Amino acid sequence: MQAVKHWLKTSDSRLAKVCFDVINSIRFFQVPTISMIHKPLYWLHNQCVTGWANLTRILYWTPLFKSRLTQCGSRFYLYSGMPQVLGNLSIEIGNNTRMSGITTLCGRSSAVQTPLLKIGSNVDVGWQNTIAVGTRVVLGDNVRLAGKVFLAGFPGHPLDPVARAQGMPETDDQVGDIVLEQDVWLATGVTVMAGVTIGQGTVVAAGSVVTRSLPSDVLAGGVPAKVIKALN
């Protein structure tokens, strides 16, 4: 098959060019858009998709996920499926919190005590977030996590190459709490390392890597993240 594709693309023969043109004509054929037909169909499609998503969210995904939680407040809103939960992990969620189902929540498997993920009230946990809990991860009230945020409470592997090759877990000195105080906002793609506390009201710019604790009410960014300016 690869030889045929190569022949069609590179051969100077008339047969190859005709075949190539015919295949492309079939490949890129499109039905004409008829507004009177396709606009209502588009609306109907969206209504069906939304209705099915809400039905499965209410009757299936939300109760299924809540059965895994240690504690869950009122008005919890789960959308786009159900988060993947890995390892031994205690999860507590406050009131009026929203969470994307395309999220991974992971507890350190070698922990002596059960790792704790504590999420406050009115918190947004966005699309493709990963929260790896080594000991404890705390998200205060009104925290906002944009898409692809990574809270790395443990790394998963030791620094020693021999131990790593043997499949040994990370060492205790690589593990730490992560605390996001009230009103913190992490923009898209932010990574927060173990042992970090981010103070109340602080905003971290997209793509930053936070390796050290940040004070309250500042804008921070960069790799590693540094304070850019005070917000108050």
Show where each model-derived region lies.
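Domain-scale signature associated with acetyltransferase and cell-envelope carbohydrate enzymes
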Residues: 1-153, 181-182, 200, 216, ...
